[in-house]
């Protein structure tokens, strides 16, 4: 199954059914035009809280608000027809209690059209995941490196090495048993990601994990090369659009200052051009 073979939007059950089959494809999106480009190629599109860093210049995801997620989620939804849309729950919107999580998840889905929410955390979030799923909200879990916990993790470090492997496996089991339809594994050793993929009965979505995961996700601006200095080890650059865009902007500025733009082909005459007479 792939997004391009579906005539209607994929659902959480469709994604779950892809476990162990054709790898699941996902990217982040924050705008309508980018979502339109992805729709034919991605199985699900993630409206990530990475939007705070990518589009708003924040130093981390911690400053992202519900309002920001709703704004960008609604924009992405307008660009999708086939791919499923999953939206991140921002920091502080779900950790306090399952009831808080339900209220905010329901709002995100109602105001954006998202088909599921994603939240970070393992065993400690299992009760919340179970609470949401029982009330009709599909949940994608996220374990390993969880960016919203960056202050307690001590940086963007690889998670699950050595003695930390068992707790991560326990996290994966807990979120699967709680009813999550998929789980993101971020920045964990490849062998551990493969082990988790074998253990749990839901799809694993890798980002800095392993090709053996059931699917992959990347931040689209990273893989398109918009940020020159920022290049994590797990990101493959499929294009270098940042330098190309800067070159185009520099050319435009040069032509404006030299009065070469706009040229005659980009301006309008005093009178509309005459239509050629029709031939009998």
UniProtKB/Swiss-Prot annotation:
The protein's required cofactors: Mg(2+)
Active site per UniProt: 186
GO biological process: pantothenate biosynthetic process
Keywords for this protein: Cytoplasm, Magnesium, Metal-binding, Pantothenate biosynthesis, Plasmid, Transferase
Protein localization: Cytoplasm
Coiled-coil ranges from the UniProt annotation: none
Enzyme Commission numbers on file: 2.1.2.11
Residues reported to bind 3-methyl-2-oxobutanoate: 49-50, 88, 118
Note on cofactor: Binds 1 Mg(2+) ion per subunit.
One Pfam family recorded for the sequence: Pantoate_transf
UniProt xrefs under Gene3D superfamilies: Phosphoenolpyruvate-binding domains
Reaction catalysed by this enzyme: 3-methyl-2-oxobutanoate + (6R)-5,10-methylene-5,6,7,8-tetrahydrofolate + H2O = 2-dehydropantoate + (6S)-5,6,7,8-tetrahydrofolate
Family per similarity comment: Belongs to the PanB family.
Protein name: 3-methyl-2-oxobutanoate hydroxymethyltransferase
Organism annotation: Ruegeria sp. (strain TM1040) (Silicibacter sp.)
């Amino acid at each position: 199954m792939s997004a391009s073979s579906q005539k209607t939007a994929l659902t959480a059950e469709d994604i779950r059914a892809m476990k162990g089959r054709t790898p699941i494809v996902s990217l982040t999106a924050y705008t309508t035009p980018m979502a339109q480009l992805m729709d034919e190629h991605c199985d699900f599109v993630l409206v990530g809280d990475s939007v705070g860093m990518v589009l708003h210049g924040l130093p981390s995801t911690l400053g992202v608000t519900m309002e920001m997620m709703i704004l960008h989620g609604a924009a992405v939804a307008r660009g999708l027809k086939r791919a499923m849309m999953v939206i991140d729950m921002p920091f502080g919107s779900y950790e306090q209690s399952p009831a808080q999580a339900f209220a905010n998840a329901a709002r995100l889905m109602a105001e954006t059209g998202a088909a599921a929410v994603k939240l970070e955390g393992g065993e400690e979030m299992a009760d919340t995941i179970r609470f949401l799923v029982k009330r009709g909200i599909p949940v994608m879990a996220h374990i390993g490196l969880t960016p919203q916990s960056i202050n307690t993790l001590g940086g963007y470090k690889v998670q699950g090495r050595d003695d930390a492997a068992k707790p991560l496996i326990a996290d994966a089991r807990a979120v699967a048993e709680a009813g999550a339809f998929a789980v993101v594994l971020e920045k964990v050793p490849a062998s551990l990601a493969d082990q988790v993929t074998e253990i749990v009965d839901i799809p694993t979505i890798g980002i800095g994990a392993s090709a053996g995961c059931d699917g992959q996700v990347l931040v689209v601006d990273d893989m398109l090369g918009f940020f020159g200095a920022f290049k994590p080890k797990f990101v493959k650059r499929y294009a270098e659009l940042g330098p190309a865009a800067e070159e185009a902007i520099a050319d435009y500025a040069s032509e404006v200052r030299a009065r070469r733009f706009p040229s005659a082909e980009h301006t309008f005459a005093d009178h509309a051009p005459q239509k050629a007479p029709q031939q009998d």
